[in-house]
């Protein structure tokens, strides 16, 4: 299969998903594509341009706020989608807002989010505040989730039983034992914590829609 910019960028995303972005080099990427390193510069001028294109692919995967529903539902769906996408591409968490040459999907995404908030009645500056606040929750949670030593509620339950509780004598840490038992009994997992925080943020923003 011949090279194209799309193939180069998709392969770069695949490598970053498996190996992280720090070790991604044009030489490593060329090897994965079975091509010479210099041939890649026909499609991307340098690593920064490659990262711009990779981030654009990530933004393409995030659902835009739908226009056929209320602003809270629309921003909720978009935030949940963003968290799911960043769980697939954790290397992108620190890069999403760092690009000085954003691609078309990146720009479309930010335009759609801003439009959703403005059409809902948020004044210009308040729409910016709302956008930053929601994104801070999404990116902060994604970063925290990427560092957790478990992925699912079942894995958390096993870790609590086998790893955490043996380190927590009940007479010394009664409240941590209480919390751990409640979480395991509830089948609690990382996504529930994100939804809890997201719904609080959206509810808190609602009264600010008509503020000057």
Predicted regions located by residue number:
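Short, basic, alpha-helical segments at the C-terminal edge of helix-turn-helix-like DNA-binding modules
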Residues: 57-61
């Amino acid at each position: 299969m011949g090279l194209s910019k799309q193939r180069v960028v998709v392969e770069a995303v695949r490598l970053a998903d498996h190996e992280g972005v720090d070790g991604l080099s044009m030489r490593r990427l060329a090897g994965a594509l079975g091509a010479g390193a210099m041939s890649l510069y026909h499609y991307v001028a340098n690593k920064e341009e490659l990262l711009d294109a990779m981030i654009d692919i990530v933004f393409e995967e995030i659902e835009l706020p739908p226009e056929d529903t209320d602003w809270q539902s629309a921003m909720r769906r978009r935030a949940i989608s963003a968290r799911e996408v960043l769980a697939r591409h954790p290397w992108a968490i620190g890069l999403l807002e760092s690009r000085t040459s954003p691609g078309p999907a990146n720009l479309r995404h930010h335009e759609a989010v801003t439009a959703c908030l403005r059409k809902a009645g948020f004044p210009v500056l308040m729409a910016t505040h709302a956008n930053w606040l929601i994104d801070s929750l999404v990116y902060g949670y994604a970063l925290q989730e990427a560092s957790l030593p478990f992925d699912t509620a079942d894995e958390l339950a096993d870790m609590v039983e086998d790893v955490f509780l043996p380190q927590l004598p009940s007479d010394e840490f009664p409240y941590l034992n209480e919390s751990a038992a409640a979480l395991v009994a509830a089948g609690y997992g990382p996504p529930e914590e994100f939804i809890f925080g997201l719904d609080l943020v959206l509810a808190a923003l609602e009264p600010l829609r008509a503020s000057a």
